[in-house]
UniProtKB/Swiss-Prot annotation:
This is Protein M2-2. The lineage of its organism: Viruses, Riboviria, Orthornavirae, Negarnaviricota, Haploviricotina. It comes from the Viruses. It comes from Avian metapneumovirus (isolate Canada goose/Minnesota/15a/2001) (AMPV). GO terms for cellular component: host cell cytoplasm. Belongs to the metapneumovirus M2-2 protein family. It is found in: Host cytoplasm. Mediates the regulatory switch from transcription to RNA replication. Acts late in infection by inhibiting viral transcription and up-regulating RNA replication. Plays a major role in antagonizing the type I IFN-mediated antiviral response. Interacts with host MAVS and prevents the interaction with its upstream partner RIGI in the signaling pathway leading to interferon production. The keyword Membrane does not apply. Keywords: Host cytoplasm, Viral RNA replication. The keyword Lyase does not apply. Interacts with host MAVS; this interaction inhibits signaling pathway leading to interferon production.
Length: 71
């Protein structure tokens, strides 16, 4: 896990029991300054994009890797 805070770009590799490995890249409008903010954003994105679209159960999702950038 490589965290550069503050950041505006977040890359996350997640593993879902049904769909295997999935790469999520988020370009944020606002800066993320803390790890707590980062966790909230990643959690929200996983629920919004992966759980709701692919109908994967949250219990089956595992975060493998997180990388953040400023620009």
């Amino acid at each position: 896990m490589t965290l550069q805070l503050p950041c505006k770009i977040v890359q996350t590799l997640i593993k879902c029991g049904e769909h295997g490995l999935i790469f999520l890249k988020m370009k944020l409008d606002d800066m993320v300054w803390t790890k707590n903010e980062l966790v909230d954003i990643i959690s929200t994105e996983i629920v919004k994009v992966h759980a709701n679209i692919f109908k994967c159960r949250l219990e089956d999702i595992e975060i493998i890797y997180v990388n953040t950038f400023l620009s």
